Regions:
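Acidic/aromatic-lined carbohydrate-recognition and catalytic surfaces
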Residues: 1-129, 137, 148-201
Length: 201
């Protein structure tokens, strides 16, 4: 098995601030290269599913309320209780933003350049199902779901390892089963053993 770290166009964090989830960065090659490798080895790729780049098309469209990108990113209002939130970095979590006269707060678990996606919007989930199928069609047989434990947020919770996240992973697994392809999902979950084990099966 060959694990390719994020090969998408990105703006920071060693490739994990993805600007376009459908492309291979020009400096790294193209989809034909990945397909060629997949002929002789299993290919594992990161699906950076929790967040996307603040410099990508989705976020630019989000600010303009255009598709694709409209309502793709997570914002909360001033009443949201984030006091229990668990996260790995210490920069300011929320950034005040005003879009078309409405003031909200952008959610940024990992960095100011990585804006968390809003999986309460079904369009975001549908988009990542399409991305997953696109990767399968281009030779990827193992998915590493990056930062998956942080995917879902609820007011007043730790915003990590919530049941809704598990349901989304199960849905992705069921779609793979329907496609009848030999594909494995691996979750990046840096959690205590009992919580880590909850992602198996």
């Amino acid at each position: 098995t060959i694990h390719f770290l994020p090969f998408y166009p990105s703006s920071s964090d060693s490739g994990f601030a993805v600007k376009d989830h459908y492309k291979v960065a020009n400096k790294l090659g193209n989809w034909s290269d990945i397909k060629n490798v997949s002929k002789s080895s299993d290919v594992m790729a990161d699906m950076v599913i929790n967040h996307s780049s603040a410099r990508g098309l989705w976020f630019k469209n989000f600010l303009k309320k255009k598709e694709p990108g409209k309502d793709y990113f997570l914002t909360v209002n001033s009443k949201f209780n984030s006091s229990k939130v668990v996260r790995p970095r210490d920069h300011k979590l929320l950034k005040k933003i005003k879009i078309f006269k409405k003031t909200d707060y952008l959610w940024r678990t990992f960095s100011p350049d990585q804006i968390d996606l809003n999986f309460k919007n079904p369009s975001v989930l549908i988009q990542f199902i399409k991305i997953m199928i696109h990767l399968i069609n281009n030779g990827v047989t193992i998915f590493r779901l990056d930062a998956i434990a942080y995917l879902w947020k609820e007011n007043g919770s730790k915003c990590i390892n919530l049941k809704q996240t598990h349901e989304i992973i199960k849905l992705l697994r069921n779609i793979i089963n329907l496609l009848n392809v030999q594909t494995t999902i691996i979750t990046e979950t840096n959690l205590p053993e009992k919580e880590n084990l909850s992602y198996f099966g």
